[in-house]
Amino acid sequence: MQEHKQKYIWGFWIISFVITSIFYMGCSGEEPFGNKEEIAGQMSLALQQKDMYCQKKLDRIDSIRNFLNVNEKRRTDEEKFQINANLYNEFKLYSFDSAFHYATQLCKIASSIDSAAYMVNAKTKLGYILARGGFFKEAIDSLSSIRIEKETLPAQVLADYYISFGRVYHDLADYAKDDVFSSKYNQIGNELLTESLSYLSDSSTIYYVRGKIALKDDKLAESKQLYRQALELCDMTDTETLSVLLSTLAFIDRRLELNDEAIYYYVKAAVNDIRSATKESVSMRGLATMLYYHKNDVNRASEYINEAFEDATFYGTRHRINVIGTLLPVFVGEKLDIEQVKRQTFQDSLILTSIFAIILIVAIIYILVQMKIG
C-alpha cells in the first residue's frame, strides 16, 4: 500500500510539473535585448523632462531678445550683429523659420559694417540654415555667391565657411541617394572639407573633419577611429557638435553591423538632443529604426519615431518629415498588429491554462480516490 501511495504521489508531482512548465512557456516572453530596461530608463527620464528643457531654451531666447531691445538704438552694428548671432544659434536647431529670420537679419546688419568677415559669416549662416530646411539649391547659391579673400579673412571664418559648404553637399548627397549624383556631391563636399583643414587649430574639429572625409570615402574603420578621437577631445558643453559626433558614430557602427554599439551611441545622442532642446536631429529616428529592425522592440520604436516626427514637424524640416513619414505608418501598423496578436495569444493561453487546470484537478481527485481505495 505504501508503494501505491508513493507511486501516486510521484504521478501527482510529475503532472503538476509538466502543466506548470507548459503554463510558463506560454505566458513568458523573451526580452528583445539585454539592456532594454537601461535604454528605456534613460530615454524615459529624458522625455519626461523634455518640456522643461524646451522652456529653458525659450527663457534664454527671451533674455537675449530683451537684452537686444534695451538701448537698441545706441548699440553699434557690431554689437547688434553679435546679439542677433546669439539668437540665430539658439534657433538654428530648434526652429527653422526663426533661425532663417535671424540669418537674414545678420546679412542686413553685415551690409552696414565695413568688414568682409561679417558678410562671409552672415552668408555662411544663411547657407547652413537653408540646407537644414531642405533648401539645398538655395543654400549652394548663397554660399557660392560669397567672395572669399583668403589673405584677409580670419582663419575661423574661412574654416566655418568651408565646413558648412562641405556639409551642404554631403547632406545633398544623403538626400539624393543615387549612384550618379551622390558620389559627385560627396566628392565636392570632401574637397571643401579638405580646404578647411588649412585654417583649423582645434584638434577635435580636425579629427571630426578628417573623420567625415573618411566616412564619405567609405573608410568606415578609419572614420570611426577619427570620430572617437574627436569625441574624446570635444567640449561637452558644445551640444551641437556632441550630437553630430555621437549620431555619426552610431551610423558607422550600424554600417559595420555593430548593432548594440550603434544603439548605445544613438541613445547618448538622443538624450543629448532632448537636453539641448534640439529639434533638427537624426538620433531619435536612428534609434527607432535600430530598435525596430534589429531588436524587434516595436513599442519603443513606435514611441521614438513619433517623437522624431513631432520634432521634425515643429522644426519645419521638409526632407526629415518626408523620410520619417515613410517609416511612421510601418512602425505604428506593426505595433497594432503585435497588440492584436498579443490579445489573441492571451486569450489562447487563458483557454489552454483553463483546460490544463481542469485536467490537473481531475488528476488530483483521481489520485486521491485511488490512494483511498488502496
Report residues per predicted region.
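Alpha-helical transmembrane signal-anchor helices
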Residues: 13-28, 336-374
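A "functional boundary" signal
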Residues: 2-14, 19-339
